[in-house]
């Protein structure tokens, strides 16, 4: 039996809903963790199960314990924190502050903000390269992706972190979130106000466009082998599948209303998508056969149940209920933490 938990960031309720996944089609909600006001973005975890989520209506991060399923503390950052990323080694976290137009560097041993770096208008979500050298941040209000050299943090030098490039997307495109493909060669950017996905060549910073036909890009994930990128498009309740090598759309997948965040479980090749829609106002294409799911749920899609390389067949789905306003979803495998440590952490909470 697997010991995996799904964490849904539920903005309107101010909670993180926790759903246990013990096997295919086996899901049950086990807890709703109260955090700060208007949490946004996926919970990001250290290897030891320290989770962090942005409280956008405040100037804090909430830390939650993946084992005890409780809020541990809040850490002050800039105004309107929106996205974050944890550097390899789990010592530092970067936070984009949409209200302060800045990037915070937080020391996770001291649990304090070390400094803020000015960015463009309204920075949103980010990713950090696997070697811990670079951070890419969507600057939503100014239409570019900020590339920062964060390699100094390997030696604890927060003062060395600096912006090295502003990679243009389009001022009207509003780049919202991004992800780095498993090979580390390309960055895929979801744009909320453009009908295309922007793809950045990491080596050259050159950009390419992949047309999806509709505005409303929100989240990006990849298959484990790096062959396919999956992009949620909120306005038409679809996931678009893109061949990473050819940069061609191979198909779309109808999902629940208002899809935003998504995560792929590489163990059984299922995807989980946040259905953010507060009401049924999504314009669904007539040719789609969307699952009849409501808002405030997750859509689970079995990505093995139909081809990904062509528009053929229908996928198998499951609806999972969470809190109000789910905007992001992540997974954490509790079996990566030794059993003795898990038991000790639960005992400390119950004592």
Report residues per predicted region.
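Predominantly soluble domains enriched in secretory-pathway, periplasmic, or organellar proteins
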Residues: 1-351
